[in-house]
């Protein structure tokens, strides 16, 4: 798998033309609502499903989307489980959208989850009209 998209819950200002094509799309809980608003279809929904709207969940079931329902009490966040799922699939490029605003603990949780990864994947978090590139073990060549 080359390119994966993780769509986090929370506010999301990303528009469709900011996105490339993806081999796999994973929605984290209410992130599924963002996926559908972008006229995309998730391959997997991960979460304890405490924030997803019932109509979105019903649509996902109708679309035969795989749903990985997690326990509410766990040692990792829904996002951490989602990103580890993608990393275990040996994806080269991971793009993350969503989770931009709202509860500050969620924002920092997402940020620290990414920073603490020991990975070889290229990770980009699209935050509004900005792209945050997280370093990995590869070299980044910036042309002049």
Language model features by range: what are they?
Residues 92-103:
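N-terminal glycine-rich phosphate/adenylate-binding segment common to multiple enzyme folds
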Residues 63-71, 122-124:
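A glycine-rich helix N-cap at a beta->alpha junction
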Residues 104-115:
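Short Gly/Thr/Asp-enriched flexible loops that form oxyanion-binding sites at enzyme active sites
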Residues 126-144:
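Long, charged alpha-helical interface segments
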Residues 68, 79-82, 101, 107, ...:
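Flexible, surface-exposed loop/linker segments and immediately adjacent secondary-structure boundaries
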Residues 1-60:
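N-terminal beta-strand-loop-alpha-helix module at the start
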Residues 67-89:
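Short phosphate-binding loop-to-helix
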Residues 22-23, 42, 64, 91, ...:
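Short, well-ordered alpha-helix to beta-strand connector turns
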